Amino acid sequence: MLVFDKVNRVYPDGTQAVKNVSVHLEKGEFCVLLGPSGAGKSTLMNMVNGLVEPSSGEIILDGGVLNKKNLQLIQRSVSMIHQQLYLIPRLSVLHNVLTGILPTANFWTSLVKSFPVKDQQRAFELLSEVGLEEKHLMRRASALSGGQQQRVAIARAFMANPKVVLADEPVASLDPAMSRSVLNSLKHAAQTNGATVLCTLHQIDYALEFADRIVALREGEVFFDGHPSDMDEDIQKRLYEIEHETKEKMQKNHQKALEDSLSFELKIKAVA
């Protein structure tokens, strides 16, 4: 079980990115975090993987506290799928998946035959689970399509048998059909391997289709936590409104910054 217990995060500039978040996620649960940019989604993810410390409250995984004092627990239990893929282009698909065990191994990349047979078998199984055919195993990762590469990243994330997998906008650059295919692969891998998935998305329809649980955030606070079937039209409408309000606010702030910069340049030229 992954537990956020009254978690807060205040940055040095005084910005409170996360406000009193309490969420309990069960083993194997596929949880989607929804909310506009700046809602606190990334901060929550970064606290789980140890990059950011809670200002107060705790994040607990099966009784152990996740923080910088307990990095071994994080390294052993938490895996990450990034929006920006970090595959090694010149390595084969199989070898890229095998690198998923390297944080707990005593060697860097080597020939595939240097990995134990059981690890190679595990990689074969994971690639099959995410829908990559055997013919792709020895191809270079750089030769694959974007959706295929994301499947490789998913398989790699499960290689070390993590308890928690964090997925940061895993379908941001994919078309709708491929996005659904990749999310289906991610959910299937999570169910098969018994891992809890915490996934950030911007698309409400994907969350409603694939999530076991949706947690929606606004300005660091949870305003919805429940099953997709509990997210009625009023809540969905409010979420769209929040997204629109946030975009307008960001655009205004950007415009003001440009105007301030231009004003400063004109003052400098006037003095000169």
From Swiss-Prot:
SMART domains, alphabetized: AAA
Domain of life per record: Bacteria
GO molecular function: ABC-type phosphonate transporter activity; ATP binding; ATP hydrolysis activity
Compartments in which it is found: Cell inner membrane
Gene3D superfamilies tied to this protein: P-loop containing nucleotide triphosphate hydrolases (3.40.50.300)
Residues annotated as signal peptide: none
GO cellular component: a single term: plasma membrane
Catalytic class of the enzyme: translocase
Residues bound to ATP: G35, P36, S37, G38, A39, G40, K41, S42
SUPFAM superfamilies from the UniProt entry: P-loop containing nucleoside triphosphate hydrolases
Keywords: ATP-binding, Cell inner membrane, Cell membrane, Membrane, Nucleotide-binding, Phosphonate transport, Translocase, Transport
Lipid bilayer topology: Peripheral membrane protein
Catalytic reaction(s) noted: phosphonate(out) + ATP + H2O = phosphonate(in) + ADP + phosphate + H(+)
Pfam family, one: ABC_tran
Segments forming domain ABC transporter: 2-244
Entry EC no(s): 7.3.2.2
Main location: membrane
PANTHER family in alphabetical order: AMINO ACID IMPORT ATP-BINDING PROTEIN, PHOSPHONATES IMPORT ATP-BINDING PROTEIN PHNC
Annotated function: Part of the ABC transporter complex PhnCDE involved in phosphonates import. Responsible for energy coupling to the transport system.
Family: Belongs to the ABC transporter superfamily. Phosphonates importer (TC 3.A.1.9.1) family.
Quaternary organization: The complex is composed of two ATP-binding proteins (PhnC), two transmembrane proteins (PhnE) and a solute-binding protein (PhnD).
Protein known as: Phosphonates import ATP-binding protein PhnC
